[in-house]
Structure formats: structure tokens, C-alpha cells
Amino acid sequence: MYYYLITLAVIALDQLTKWIVVQNMEIGQKIEVIPGFLYWTSYRNDGAAWSILEGHMWFFYLITVVVIGIIIYIMQKYAKGKRLFSISLAFILGGAIGNFIDRVLHQEVVDFVQTVWGNYYFPIFNVADASLSVGVVLMLVYVFVDDRKTKGIK
């Protein structure tokens, strides 16, 4: 059940950071955090992570509810006793719920983290997006490690 605490922490941090951005920054405003690398940039997104499929909100409502239900089912049925698996699902669930809250309440998602690598500007994202990414990476690690254990590889 500890994994639900991770989910709640992700949701709380996501919503708090978005609230701070909305209360203190104009849309489009940019604050340099680490010169030439990291900026807080107030942006609104009506698509998925990194602005994928902008303008199709009904699709995200439906998909997100289904995904949240599936993740909770998997957590209850299969994740018990599998620490890395349950943690990865907790991060994915927290990210999904964090952005879902924005979509339901505001019909858009608040994004604000912007990174720059030389001349490349990575798409602006938020804590929920980062949590989804961390969850997927942890899931891949779990699958790789579990596969090696199953095959008896050290």
C-alpha cells in the first residue's frame, strides 16, 4: 500500500507546482533557473505529454479513466510483493491523475519545465509528465531485471 503514498505525493507536488506557476507567472513568461539549461516557462497544453494530439480533450478523458482503472487493477492484483513494479506503477498513476485533474478542471494542462540542450529546446513539461517518464523507465528496468531472473542470468 506504500505505493499509493508515492502516487499521492506525486499528485500533491504536481498540483502545488502548477498552482504556484498559475498564481505567479503570466502565460509565456520565462524564468531562468540554470543559465542556458533550465527555465520555468508558463505554458498551457490541451494535448498529451509534450503537446501530442492537442485539441482532442474527450479522447484524453476516456483514455485516462481507462488507464487509471487498469493501473489500479494491476497494482491490486499483480504488484504486491514486487517493489520496483509497484513503485513504477505508482509514478505512472500519479502522473496520469495529476494531468487528468488539470484536464477536468481547466480543459488544459499547466506545463512549466523547459530544458535546453545547445540549440534544442525540449518540449515544456510538468511534474506529472516527469513522473510518467520516471514510471516508464522504472517499469523497463523491472521488466529487464525480472526477465534476467526468470532466465537465471546474473
Curated annotation (Swiss-Prot):
The chain crosses the membrane at residues 55-75, 84-104, 124-144. It catalyses: Release of signal peptides from bacterial membrane prolipoproteins. Hydrolyzes -Xaa-Yaa-Zaa-|-(S,diacylglyceryl)Cys-, in which Xaa is hydrophobic (preferably Leu), and Yaa (Ala or Ser) and Zaa (Gly or Ala) have small, neutral side chains. GO terms for biological process: proteolysis. The active site is at D111, D129. GO terms for molecular function: aspartic-type endopeptidase activity; endopeptidase activity. GO terms for cellular component: plasma membrane. Its main location: membrane. Pathway: Protein modification; lipoprotein biosynthesis (signal peptide cleavage). It is a multi-pass membrane protein. Its EC number is 3.4.23.36. It is found in: Cell membrane. It comes from the Bacteria. Keywords: Aspartyl protease, Cell membrane, Hydrolase, Membrane, Protease, Transmembrane, Transmembrane helix. This protein specifically catalyzes the removal of signal peptides from prolipoproteins. Belongs to the peptidase A8 family. This is Lipoprotein signal peptidase. It comes from Listeria monocytogenes serovar 1/2a (strain ATCC BAA-679 / EGD-e).
